[in-house]
Curated annotation (Swiss-Prot):
It comes from Pectobacterium carotovorum subsp. carotovorum (strain PC1). Keywords: Chaperone, Cytoplasm, Stress response. Its main location: cytoplasm. Residues 1-20 have a biased composition (Basic and acidic residues). This is Protein GrpE. Gene3D superfamilies: 3.90.20.20, Head domain of nucleotide exchange factor GrpE (2.30.22.10). PROSITE patterns: GRPE (PS01071). GO terms for molecular function: adenyl-nucleotide exchange factor activity; protein homodimerization activity; protein-folding chaperone binding; unfolded protein binding. It comes from the Bacteria.
Length: 195
């Protein structure tokens, strides 16, 4: 070997380092083109995480909406319970009111000896009607109003020149509502056009 070909150990190490750098430089473009499988896995997991977070937000919104609906329904149920708690009692009081009105209709008002009793029945009826009005009970018993099937029950239709067609011309039995809800329809005679 010639002296030029022989290298010192330091030179050999330098040559090896340069060769290694060259190989790394050559290999670097190849590895840059090849995707690291860990990066793909990370991207996949991030996508799953994002999807799960969105589902969780949607579920939370649904749960909150359902809770609000349950709360509102409960409040409405309590309100209805308070508003219509007296419905059964009111229904039982209607025949009492009817009987007092019938007693006044059939009483002999010309008889002076019955005047005090008639006045007592009138005051009792007035007091009872005032008491039930305080709880939202209203009388349905007007005449000369248009027939309303929601609060009237037509018992008969009669021809009449004095009333417009389809108007209440006579109330046979008064009806009642409780806070706008029908307790009992008014039984009425309805006018129809004369032939």
């Amino acid at each position: 070997m010639s002296s030029k070909e022989q290298k010192t150990p330091d030179e050999q190490v330098l040559d090896q380092k340069e060769a290694a750098k060259g190989q790394q430089a050559d290999a670097a473009p190849e590895t840059a083109d090849v995707a690291d499988p860990r990066d793909a896995r990370i991207a996949e997991l991030e996508a799953q995480l994002s999807e799960l977070q969105q589902r969780e937000r949607d579920n939370m919104l649904r749960v909150r909406a359902e809770a609000d609906n349950v709360r509102r329904r409960a409040e409405m149920d309590v309100e209805k319970a308070h508003k219509f708690a007296v419905e059964k009692f009111a229904s039982e009081m209607l025949p009492v009111i009817d009987n007092l009105e019938r007693a006044l209709d059939t009483a002999d008002k010309a008889n002076e000896s019955l005047a005090a009793m008639i006045e007592g029945v009138e005051l009792t009826l007035k007091s009872l009607l005032d008491a039930v009005r305080k709880f939202g009970i209203e009388v349905v018993g007007d005449v000369n109003v248009p027939f309303n099937p929601e609060v009237h029950q037509a018992m008969t239709m009669l021809p009449s020149a004095d009333h417009q067609p389809n108007h209440v011309m006579m109330v046979m039995q008064k009806g009642y509502t409780l806070n706008g809800r029908l307790l009992r329809p008014a039984m009425v005679a309805v006018s129809k056009a004369q032939d």
